[in-house]
Amino acid sequence: MKLPKEGDFITIQSYKHDGRLHRTWRDTMVLKTTENALIGVNDHTLVTESDGRRWVTREPAIVYFHKKYWFNIIAMIRDNGVSYYCNLASPYLMDAEALKYIDYDLDVKVFADGEKRLLDVDEYEMHKQEMHYSPNLDFILKENVKLLVDWINKEKGPFSKAYVSIWYKRYLELKNR
């Protein structure tokens, strides 16, 4: 499959481990693709939940997906600074329909002041039992939480101020041409 190119719009689909569609984002603008990663932006993007509810994202957000890491990262650009929402999730795959991944409930939120919180641990434990996550999957996800926190602490990749600034600037250039 041909990779989307800068300025293309794609759909993102999040699934649960049992194969159910969880959430869909329409019209994410692609900023960069490589063999293993995709960087995009959501700005007033339509989101549809599995129960049919719809909402629109409030602020611009740089999104980062990778084919080798078990997480994706959303850098939300707000008036009080950049906040991050990080989903523990399968590496993504891309087909003609959408960018797709499996959401594994655990999330790490980083507030603009640097405070970090691990979210949805109870939901993860419940789904781990209900959907029979293997011990190996559980290990991979917990190791990737550690890796993610290390990236946050070291301001690596999407967690660097320069990264957000560069990609947001590029988005504005593409949006305004």
Curated annotation (Swiss-Prot):
User: Which cofactors does the annotated protein need, by name?
Assistant: Mg(2+)
Q: Which residues form the active site?
A: 23 (proton donor)
Q: Which GO terms describe its molecular function?
A: magnesium ion binding; nucleoside diphosphate phosphatase activity; ribonucleoside triphosphate phosphatase activity
Reactions that this protein is recorded to catalyse: a ribonucleoside 5'-triphosphate + H2O = a ribonucleoside 5'-diphosphate + phosphate + H(+); a ribonucleoside 5'-diphosphate + H2O = a ribonucleoside 5'-phosphate + phosphate + H(+)
Q: Name one Pfam family in it.
A: DUF402
Q: What is its EC number?
A: 3.6.1.15, 3.6.1.6
Tell me the residue numbers annotated for binding Mg(2+) 2. Answer: 105, 107, 120, 123
Question: Superkingdom of the source?
Answer: Bacteria
Alphabetical UniProt keywords: Hydrolase, Magnesium, Metal-binding
**Which parts of the sequence bind Mg(2+) 1?**
87, 103, 107
Q: Which family does it belong to?
A: Belongs to the Ntdp family.
Task: Give the function comment from the record.
Answer: Has nucleoside phosphatase activity towards nucleoside triphosphates and nucleoside diphosphates.
Question: Under what name is this protein listed?
Answer: Nucleoside triphosphate/diphosphate phosphatase
